[in-house]
Curated annotation (Swiss-Prot):
Keywords: ATP-binding, Ligase, Nucleotide-binding, Protein biosynthesis. It comes from Desulfurococcus amylolyticus (strain DSM 18924 / JCM 16383 / VKM B-2413 / 1221n). SMART domains: GatB_Yqey. Heterodimer of GatD and GatE. Belongs to the GatB/GatE family. GatE subfamily. GO terms for biological process: glutaminyl-tRNAGln biosynthesis via transamidation; translation. Signal peptide: none annotated. The lineage of its organism: Archaea, Thermoproteota, Thermoprotei, Desulfurococcales, Desulfurococcaceae. NCBIfam families: gatE_arch, PRK04028.1. Allows the formation of correctly charged Gln-tRNA(Gln) through the transamidation of misacylated Glu-tRNA(Gln) in organisms which lack glutaminyl-tRNA synthetase. The reaction takes place in the presence of glutamine and ATP through an activated gamma-phospho-Glu-tRNA(Gln). The GatDE system is specific for glutamate and does not act on aspartate. It holds the Pfam family GatB_N. InterPro entries: Asn/Gln-tRNA_amidoTrfase_suB/E, Asn/Gln-tRNA_Trfase_suB/E_cat, Asn/Gln_amidotransferase, Asn/Gln_tRNA_amidoTrase-B-like, GAD-like_sf, GAD_dom, GatB_C_1, GatB_Yqey_C_2. The keyword Thylakoid does not apply. This is Glutamyl-tRNA(Gln) amidotransferase subunit E.
Amino acid sequence: MSRINYSETGLKVGLEIHVQLDTARKLFCKCPTLLSEAEAREVFTRYLRPAKSEVGEIDRAALLEWKKNKKYEYEAPVESSCLVEADEEPPHEINEDALLVALALASSMNMRIINEIHVMRKMVIDGSNVSGFQRTALIAVNGYIMDNEEKIGIQTLCLEEDAARKIDESETTVRYRIDRLGIPLVEVATAPDIHDPEQAVRVALKIGQLIRLTGRAKRGLGTIRQDLNISIKGGAKVEIKGVQHLYLISKVIEYEVLRQLKLLEIRDELVKRGVSPENISDNIIDVTDVFRDTGSKIVKKALSIPGGGVYAVVLRGFKGLLGIEIQPGRRFGSELADYARIWGGVGGIFHTDELPNYGITREEVQALYMKTGADPGIDAIVIVADVKQKAVEALKAVVERARIAVIGVPEETRAANPDGTTKYMRPRPGSARMYPETDIPPIYITPELMEKASKLIPEPPEKKLEKYVREHGLSTELAKAVINDLRLDLYERLVEKYMGKIPASIIASTLVNIIPSLRRDGVPIENIDDYVIEDVLDAVANNEIAKEAIPDVLSSIARNPGKSIKDVIKELGLGVVSISELDELINEAIKKNMDKITAKREKAFQIVMSEVMKSVRGRIDGALVAEKVREKLKEILK
């Protein structure tokens, strides 16, 4: 997969797997766990600020969010939110169903369950929690799962409330919808025992399987999220948030290792050049006059804003380093730009390693060096075009990041991009953001609770695989696909419902082969929900359609949502063929092709079968057609 030798780099990876639980109500109120797309009649506004922790400290990540000075607006759909989400009413008692799932999951991972659970408040003031904190409860610690022959430590399992959904964002305002706020979420955190990208995928898959095997995991986009903690020898611990897809995990790890290795190379080069943090000046220079007559559209636009100008900092000894690629499509200059955007709120930066470009001419670059007194042979210049206050804050952040570059890799929280690269998000949060939830009494884990939870402990994936092959008659490959599928719980329910009517292999194939195939063909499979699948299988079980018609029926329903299955069957002409009709069609096919049949006896079956299937495909079981054709040909060709 990669040329990186991960054992030499000393790679350590820890996973945090977050999965929404499919419970009837939210974690601390009676509201249903349903997302609402209806127009919200209630909208309210909040401004959030950080509070000091129990030891009098303010978390630096919370401080960053506060400095953005954002207004937060909240849409409150009445069907899935109440005064608890609006932080106008104390939380109710914890959802016991969610607690039981968490206890069962902890047991399945050999964890030590805490006998007295205290709900905590974790400070979050990015607006995603109306109260400014997320309620979270530590359920269990110190467990493990097996990856091949190796133990992977499971450090903690927490039960917490999910955040609100971000709907829109502008420069001054963020808008959220609070229907998702409070949905129960389990967070499983592994120890940093993972040492290569493929192992990380296996471990994430296994934890995800265990959660799904409880039968209580929600499905759909956004219901599962992986965060990664990654470090290498000589580098730093970096948290990467929001890896949505399993297949991206290995790529994110590879690209983060590459980034840290490149940053260490840049550090070594800076040291070699004699650069130290102390000689990186934070002197910000107004260079607006250099660009008064610029042809750059971006700079012109900035200068047209009242108070707009162009400002610069000189990075002594950095020439050529800002253009070094540290991840595919991202350079060291991209890292500086991330800091400028987050801390200054600007759109981006220019730097001399990429100029002349973007309408900025060679003459303007030369004038820039003259104006700042920088050495064109060894120095780099970073410029920002914006109002002075924002530009100054952005360039201060650039200088701070440049100083860190001389030391090495910074500890930080980064966001995953869809291509597996990452961007700076905020400093790593400290321990100062957690304090007790005083509105919820301690929860005591009694033998009665553990007895209830024991009924939800998932069967290990290995045993489930063996069962599907032995009892359900699935191939090993198909059984593995089912266990890895998000509709695993649906599969088990449908197998039980259609026992003796539809083979388990047909149900499995519908879920893991047919539906993904339709997606690849451009069919809008988001319109195929559990009810649609069940309706189609009902039609198969009741002999209204043959199993061969399943793809066509699902495709038609997906393209015409709201249309009844009976109408679809009628429009597609998929009514089941009777045995007498089949016999008649076989006789007609034989009569029509008698000359070919007698001339090519060895191909007689293919000739007749092909002719008959033109008329009955999707309307009767192909195996039955084949059986009837063979019987008829046996009579004729004696």
